[in-house]
């Protein structure tokens, strides 16, 4: 396992995710002093040669304040209207605050398809790369004016992880309302301990993550752990820390409490990073023990090892592979449509032509199109006792 670097200035490219509750106060609106302090931190990092990208929540929260919408859950059309108003205000505030340090901000609004569809993914990556090359700071958010319940990231933690892997960042920082991952909710358990270093996201670590989220923010510790799995598998370290300090990034360097998640020692290729990071696999293949062993040995997934096929997918779609314990172990690109996959599941590759009427591929998922998503072989450290949840 690699160790945390001594200073943020030792990283080359950092993605910073900022939640709505940190940026927006329900009664007073945008927290100007806090935003200015964060922008000062960003300017200090850039002065040391660090490239910085920001994934900023807050459009809906800011828009509902401007529009004086009532508290509680919003209808979809209300959220979209709030986002339309809030996005303009949010971008303006970021631009004005960064301009104090002569830094140009560039707004990018993404939808789920921009990271899930390969061509759009590459185009979005090229745009962000060009902004960085020109010296601008990309301010990224989900395009909530067009996103629907069915086609959305659902939270900016996972969006930030996708941006980090897309852009080849070596550190993702999630600013939260808590200073890291605890073994239990610290407000409920006086014995709860902060985990300063997480070597690997194991089932025990996942069990510590809760799903609580505030009214202003859709995310919780559960989504932060999901983000960590996406980022670390691509070789990107992750930090969860409190954003309540006026200068939270400077605070990390000055010793503020945080949890550091180690990047994988064997990050997957850029193409496999995209496959592994897909947020909505189109289907599921349940496999037997023999197939699971073969996949861990780097082999392709053959039809004989598939016990069950779920979902509706087409050849080339990303699908999830689930082992006997019901946990996802891999993801890959389907070699067959779902209906064909069901017909050949459990059969030998030599029988495919007789079953389908044509000689198709021998593998359900070829090893070149498959990436393991369940890490094995490393310990998570001493403080990995299973708890019900962690305060988010």
Swiss-Prot record:
Residues 282-359 form the PUA domain. Substrate binds at residues 57, 144, 156. Pathway: Amino-acid biosynthesis; L-proline biosynthesis; L-glutamate 5-semialdehyde from L-glutamate: step 1/2. One of its GO terms (cellular component) is cytosol. It comes from the Bacteria. Its main location: cytoplasm. Pfam families: AA_kinase (PF00696), PUA (PF01472). Its EC number is 2.7.2.11. Keywords: Amino-acid biosynthesis, ATP-binding, Cytoplasm, Kinase, Nucleotide-binding, Proline biosynthesis, Transferase. One of its GO terms (molecular function) is glutamate 5-kinase activity. Residues 373-392 are annotated as: Disordered. It catalyses: L-glutamate + ATP = L-glutamyl 5-phosphate + ADP. CDD domains: AAK_G5K_ProB, PUA_G5K. GO terms for biological process: L-proline biosynthetic process. HAMAP family: ProB. Catalyzes the transfer of a phosphate group to glutamate to form L-glutamate 5-phosphate. This is Glutamate 5-kinase. The lineage of its organism: Bacteria, Pseudomonadati, Pseudomonadota, Alphaproteobacteria, Hyphomicrobiales.
């Amino acid at each position: 396992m690699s160790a945390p670097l001594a200073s943020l200035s030792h990283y080359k490219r950092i993605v910073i995710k900022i939640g709505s509750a940190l940026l927006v106060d329900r009664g007073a609106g945008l927290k100007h002093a806090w935003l200015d302090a964060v922008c000062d931190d960003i300017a200090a990092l850039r002065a040391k040669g660090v490239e910085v990208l920001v994934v900023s929540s807050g459009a809906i929260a800011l828009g509902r304040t401007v529009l004086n919408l009532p508290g509680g859950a919003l209808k979809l059309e209300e959220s979209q209207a709030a986002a339309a108003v809030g996005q303009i205000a949010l971008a303006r505030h970021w631009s004005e605050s960064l301009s104090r340090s002569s830094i140009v901000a560039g707004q990018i609004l993404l939808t789920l398809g921009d990271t899930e569809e390969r061509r759009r993914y590459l185009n979005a990556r090229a745009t962000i790369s060009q902004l960085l090359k020109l010296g601008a700071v990309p301010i990224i958010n989900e395009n909530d004016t067009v996103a629907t319940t069915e086609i959305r990231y659902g939270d900016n933690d996972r969006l930030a992880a996708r941006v980090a892997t897309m852009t080849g960042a070596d550190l993702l920082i999630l600013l939260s309302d808590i200073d890291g991952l605890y073994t239990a909710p610290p407000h409920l358990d006086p014995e709860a301990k902060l985990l300063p270093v997480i070597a690997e996201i194991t089932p025990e670590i996942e069990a510590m993550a809760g799903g609580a989220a505030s009214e202003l923010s859709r995310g919780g510790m559960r989504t932060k752990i999901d983000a960590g799995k996406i980022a670390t598998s691509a070789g990107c370290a992750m930090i969860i820390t409190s954003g309540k300090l006026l200068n939270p990034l400077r605070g990390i360097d000055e010793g503020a409490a945080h949890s550091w998640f180690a990047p994988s020692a064997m990050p997957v290729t850029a193409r496999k990073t995209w496959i592994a990071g897909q947020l909505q696999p189109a289907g599921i293949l349940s496999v037997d023990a023999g197939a699971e062993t073969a996949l861990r040995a780097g082999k392709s997934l053959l039809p004989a090892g598939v016990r069950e096929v779920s979902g509706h997918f087409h050849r080339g779609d990303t699908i999830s592979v689930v082992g006997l314990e019901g946990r996802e172990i891999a993801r890959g690109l389907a070699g067959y449509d779902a209906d064909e996959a069901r017909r050949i599941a459990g059969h030998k590759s030599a029988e495919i032509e007789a079953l389908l009427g044509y000689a198709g591929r021998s593998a359900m998922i070829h090893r070149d199109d498959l990436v393991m998503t369940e890490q094995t072989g490393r310990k998570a450290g001493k403080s990995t006792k299973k708890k019900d949840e962690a305060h988010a």
